[in-house]
């Protein structure tokens, strides 16, 4: 079965996500692979594909802050902390928020927090809006290989039948910056 998705085929991508599949799509800097954050089956597939241990935790990417609220606890943020986050969103900055006990461990790993981002990539915004929630998002690359920056690189690493939402990345050279939402501490330079 050929799962390659034509440009703009958001409906086909949503159908695959509903079936607990992992898909690839362009983000601000590189292609990402993602899945339904509420499906342990889908997340397990993604972790196996990436050869990534569950205890490392994952990132959620969303079209809006509202989509992220069920997975994080922003109640302890001050007005200044909230402003610092929203000054960067939508955009290529990921923030680590406290996570409520209801957030699945397959997302948070060994942490009591979760990394989240409101993207400004139009294709990912459309995908998250059509799906109605955020996606787990991690760089599209197999262990030890560089992140994919084109559809062709995704196909070379994951195979011709791997489902890819075709489109261009946002042109950034580096993956998203990661910061602590409470302290502003920089975890990864963007």
UniProtKB/Swiss-Prot annotation:
Pfam family, one: Sua5_yciO_yrdC
Entry EC no(s): 2.7.7.87
InterPro entries: DHBP_synth_RibB-like_a/b_dom, Sua5-like_dom, TC-AMP_synthase, TC-AMP_synthase_SUA5
Catalytic reactions of this protein: L-threonine + hydrogencarbonate + ATP = L-threonylcarbamoyladenylate + diphosphate + H2O
Keywords per UniProt: ATP-binding, Cytoplasm, Nucleotide-binding, Nucleotidyltransferase, Transferase, tRNA processing
GO biological process: regulation of translational fidelity; tRNA threonylcarbamoyladenosine modification
Chief subcellular location: cytoplasm
GO molecular function per UniProt: ATP binding; double-stranded RNA binding; L-threonylcarbamoyladenylate synthase; tRNA binding
Protein name: Threonylcarbamoyl-AMP synthase
Species annotation: Salmonella paratyphi B (strain ATCC BAA-1250 / SPB7)
Gene: tsaC
